[in-house]
Amino acid sequence: MVTAHFVLIHTICHGAWIWHKLKPALERAGHKVTALDMAASGIDPRQIEQINSFDEYSEPLLTFLEKLPQGEKVIIVGESCAGLNIAIAADRYVDKIAAGVFHNSLLPDTVHSPSYTVEKLLESFPDWRDTEYFTFTNITGETITTMKLGFVLLRENLFTKCTDGEYELAKMVMRKGSLFQNVLAQRPKFTEKGYGSIKKVYIWTDQDKIFLPDFQRWQIANYKPDKVYQVQGGDHKLQLTKTEEVAHILQEVADAYA
């Protein structure tokens, strides 16, 4: 079996803690694993009101790739909204990325605005239940909407089949976050030369209660990945509810692309 260096990227409002089950599962198989907190996430000391864009939010990933030794490549695994982090990183450091893995994730394309899949997600799932919304003005004068994910949303739509302990952990450590949708809408498209050229693997389940099946099928049809894996059962957090299945898939990704 081939071993690889996996870099695990959480979604907005979360942190590296979301990978606490998958990281050791991959390490037991001999892989190197780095789980990063994005800006104003997890234990990163910044507040979301200090972050001006999704690119700035991605800074820890970009800094990590910048420092990666020349010739070394990683497989980036992004959950949920972290597909955007993968795209941003691939446009800057395409030579350092062996593949991008989209885990029940946004799958942006290179044809439309970077906000396109966000807009489609919000059309598919417009009511974020008991989520609270706030606004602030960023450095360029844009009004940024932030959110604190509601506990009902977390339990019924994200951590649907997770244990009570995993749900309680999420409630305790969840932070405010943002999709930076209006800033993404003005951002240049992702490039064919960068993001468009990396290998893309899509992992999903039709039991996801926020990235609904029709939305995920639409994404796959819109920007066809190199490989698609459909996991049976689970929920939005496959890394928690189907840990071994995801680890097995990632081994196949390593065998193919590392």
Curated annotation (Swiss-Prot):
Keywords: Lyase. Its EC number is 4.1.2.47. Acetone binds at T11, S80, C81. The record marks D208 as: Increases basicity of active site His. It is an enzyme of class 4 (lyase). Exact pH optimum pH is difficult to determine due to the fact that acetone cyanohydrin is very unstable above pH 6.5 but HNL activity was found to rise from pH 3.5 to pH 5.4. The pH of the cell sap of damages cassava leaves was found to be 5.3. 2-hydroxy-2-methylpropanenitrile binds at T11, S80. It catalyses: a monosubstituted aliphatic (S)-hydroxynitrile = an aldehyde + hydrogen cyanide; a disubstituted aliphatic (S)-hydroxynitrile = a ketone + hydrogen cyanide; an aromatic (S)-hydroxynitrile = an aromatic aldehyde + hydrogen cyanide; 2-hydroxy-2-methylpropanenitrile = acetone + hydrogen cyanide. Changing W128A: Slightly reduced affinity and catalytic activity toward acetone cyanohydrin but increased efficiency on mandelonitrile. Acquired ability to use 4-hydroxymandelonitrile as substrate. This enzyme can be used as a biocatalyst for stereoselective synthesis of a wide array of (S)-cyanohydrins by addition of HCN to aldehydes or ketones. Optically active cyanohydrins are interesting intermediates for the synthesis of alpha-hydroxy acids, alpha-hydroxy ketones, or beta-ethanolamines, all of which are important building blocks in organic synthesis. The keyword Cytoplasm does not apply. Involved in cyanogenesis, the release of HCN from cyanogenic glycosides in injured tissues; the release of toxic HCN is believed to play a central role in the defense mechanism of plants against herbivores and microbial attack. Decomposes a variety of cyanohydrins (alpha-hydroxynitriles) into HCN and the corresponding aldehydes or ketones; two natural substrates are 2-hydroxy-2-methylpropanenitrile (acetone cyanohydrin) and 2-hydroxy-2-methylbutanenitrile (2-butanone cyanohydrin), but in vitro can also act on 2-hydroxy-2-methylpentanenitrile (2-pentanone cyanohydrin) and mandelonitrile. Homotetramer. Belongs to the AB hydrolase superfamily. Hydroxynitrile lyase family. This is (S)-hydroxynitrile lyase.
